[in-house]
Amino acid sequence: MAQKTFTVTADSGIHARPATTLVQAASKFDSDINLEFNGKTVNLKSIMGVMSLGIQKGATITISAEGSDEADALAALEDTMSKEGLGE
């Protein structure tokens, strides 16, 4: 399993648009990809799951991937977080 922790830097946190961007990026991979926030873990391929967390600016989140393309998935999601200005 590969994982990376981020601090959310987007002013509006992870609301509908950024959640959709992350879900689309995660859905390209076969690995199981999860997002953990505040003790809750959701499937990062589920828009409703991600939005249900109510992630605000300054929050610490962990994205984990497990499967045949886990390293590629995590690298792509890290790139998405950075390019979209969502976190670091």
Curated annotation (Swiss-Prot):
InterPro entries in the cross-refs: HPr, HPr-like, HPr-like_sf, PTS_HPr_His_P_site, PTS_HPr_Ser_P_site
Residues annotated as catalytic: 15
Residue span(s) of domain HPr: 1-88
GO cellular component: cytoplasm
Localization terms from the record: Cytoplasm
Sites of Phosphoserine modification: 12, 46
CDD domains per the UniProt record, alphabetical: PTS-HPr_like (cd00367)
GO-annotated biological processes: phosphoenolpyruvate-dependent sugar phosphotransferase system
Regulation: Phosphorylation on Ser-46 inhibits the phosphoryl transfer from enzyme I to HPr.
Keywords on record: Cytoplasm, Phosphoprotein, Phosphotransferase system, Sugar transport, Transcription, Transcription regulation, Transport
Chief location: cytoplasm
Record family assignment: Belongs to the HPr family.
Annotated function: General (non sugar-specific) component of the phosphoenolpyruvate-dependent sugar phosphotransferase system (sugar PTS). This major carbohydrate active-transport system catalyzes the phosphorylation of incoming sugar substrates concomitantly with their translocation across the cell membrane. The phosphoryl group from phosphoenolpyruvate (PEP) is transferred to the phosphoryl carrier protein HPr by enzyme I. Phospho-HPr then transfers it to the PTS EIIA domain.
Protein known as: Phosphocarrier protein HPr
Source organism of the structure: Priestia megaterium
